[in-house]
Swiss-Prot record:
Positions bound to substrate: 5-10
Gene: GGCT2;1
Disruption phenotype: No visible phenotype under normal growth conditions, but mutant plants show increased tolerance to arsenite and cadmium.
Listed EC numbers: 4.3.2.9
The organism of origin for this protein: Arabidopsis thaliana
Keywords recorded for this protein, A-Z: Cytoplasm, Lyase
UniProt xrefs under InterPro entries: ChaC, GGCT-like
Domain of life of the organism encoding this protein: Eukaryota
Cell location: Cytoplasm
Family: Belongs to the gamma-glutamylcyclotransferase family.
GO MF assignments: gamma-glutamylcyclotransferase activity; glutathione specific gamma-glutamylcyclotransferase activity
Protein name from the UniProt record: Gamma-glutamylcyclotransferase 2-1
GO CC list: cytoplasm
Cofactor note: Binds 2 Mn(2+) ions per subunit.
Length: 216
């Protein structure tokens, strides 16, 4: 038996587990959105970060990295135990088909695990839902947690997508809006309080392609 896992957020640049093969490619009918709260890595229960999850969207594609773990049940178990601890804010695991640029009609791997979240604020305390770009940017610009600040996560994702040569306008637009927030005068920043989410209650400059500068 072989384990395949698809990463579309920090797993792209920081898998953190022992794997045997990495492929760059995409899954179909999903898009990346910053609609999930993170309260223990890049944010806190009082001021949650915004991190990636997937939203079903017919005709969309989401680029990322697929990791293969071979070597028997024990190795696969160790990888999954690590991932389930790390991805604890995702309440679902979905099986998807994984494609590469070499063949867009036939998946190169089937039965690939991807961590997803239920898009419902009632049943899923970590689901923030969509928000205006400026509001999301303000939340990302101000949130921080034990593993670092939220904006670093976003900027690293932006760079990771650049590195795999599949930049995403949604990520770039959000990252640039965060940069705008960070460039505000200090007296204006002081008026922009961090976004407080329902999670705390429940749980106590776009540069030309291939030449982008990733300033934080």
């Amino acid at each position: 038996m072989v384990l395949w896992v698809f990463g579309y957020g920090s797993l792209i640049w920081n898998p953190g587990f022992d794997f045997d093969e990495k492929l760059i490619g995409y899954i179909k009918d999903y898009k990346r959105v910053f609609d999930l709260a993170c309260i223990d890595h890049r944010g806190t229960p009082e001021h949650p970060a915004r991190t990636c999850t997937l939203e079903q969207s017919t005709g969309a594609i989401c680029w990322g990295a697929a990791y293969c773990v071979r070597g028997g049940p024990e190795k696969e178990k160790l990888a999954m135990e690590y991932l389930e601890r790390r991805e604890c804010e995702y309440d679902s695991k979905t099986l998807v088909e994984f494609y590469t640029e070499n063949d867009t009609s036939t998946p190169i791997v089937t039965g690939v695990i991807v961590f997803t979240s239920t898009p419902d604020k009632v049943s899923n305390k970590y689901y923030l839902g969509p928000a205006p770009l400026e509001e999301m940017a303000r939340q990302i610009a101000t949130a921080s947690g034990p593993c670092g600040n939220n904006r670093e996560y976003l900027f690293k994702l932006e760079k990771a997508m650049f590195d795999i040569e599949h930049e995403e306008e949604y990520v770039i637009e959000l990252a640039n809006e965060v940069r705008k927030q960070l460039d505000l005068p200090e007296e204006v920043k002081a008026l922009l309080k961090p976004i407080v989410s329902h999670v705390s209650v429940k749980s106590q400059a776009h540069v030309s392609t291939r030449q982008r500068v990733f300033a934080s």
